[in-house]
């Protein structure tokens, strides 16, 4: 975003492009970290100044942070073998997994257009995946009902990391998931 107002004792200027990691200082939206808020009020020291030419790509810092956080949550188990969702977050997660773990992952994506643009990893419609041995799965799809479809592809004792931004409460058929355990 851009600074619209600042105090005299700060090292930022009105109009400066900035990134605000993990802010809870939203003023008009009560949501996850205020990411959908129109404005945020934060101490100047929390701001990360961005080059003017960066445009809106600075938002990728937040998504990369989310992708890295999801990978850290799974680090004792290993990188995911399946990533659900090929939006910006899913693409970052796949690329970070490949770069950091030298592991090629499979990504599920239900939208045909979003299945395009992979760089060395496989992107499938979930209905095309015949595997039933996924040990580590990371969902970044935002689809609150994807677990029922995914659980049938899990190996016994698989781990699911939920790292998407869901518009509705996550729901799943507990008996089917329990039977995979």
Explain the meaning of each model-derived region:
Residues 57-128:
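Mid-domain Rossmann-like dinucleotide-binding core that forms the NAD(H)/NADP(H) cofactor-binding site
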């Amino acid at each position: 975003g851009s600074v619209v107002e600042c105090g005299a004792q700060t090292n930022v200027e009105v109009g400066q492009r900035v990134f605000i990691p993990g802010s809870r200082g939203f003023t008009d939206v009560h949501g996850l970290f205020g990411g959908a808020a129109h404005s945020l009020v934060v101490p100047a020291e929390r701001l990360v100044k961005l080059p003017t030419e960066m445009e809106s790509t600075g938002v990728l810092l937040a998504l990369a942070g989310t992708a890295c956080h999801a990978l850290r949550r799974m680090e004792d188990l290993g990188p995911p073998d399946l990533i659900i969702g090929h939006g910006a977050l899913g693409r970052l997660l796949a690329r970070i997994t490949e770069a950091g773990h030298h592991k090629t992952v499979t990504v599920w994506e239900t939208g045909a257009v979003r299945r395009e643009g992979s760089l060395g990893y496989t992107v499938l419609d979930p209905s095309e995946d015949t595997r039933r041995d996924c040990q580590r799965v990371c969902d970044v799809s935002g689809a609150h009902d994807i677990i029922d479809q995914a659980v049938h592809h899990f190996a016994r004792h698989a781990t699911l990391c939920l790292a998407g931004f869901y518009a509705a409460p996550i729901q799943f058929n507990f008996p089917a998931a329990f039977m995979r355990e």
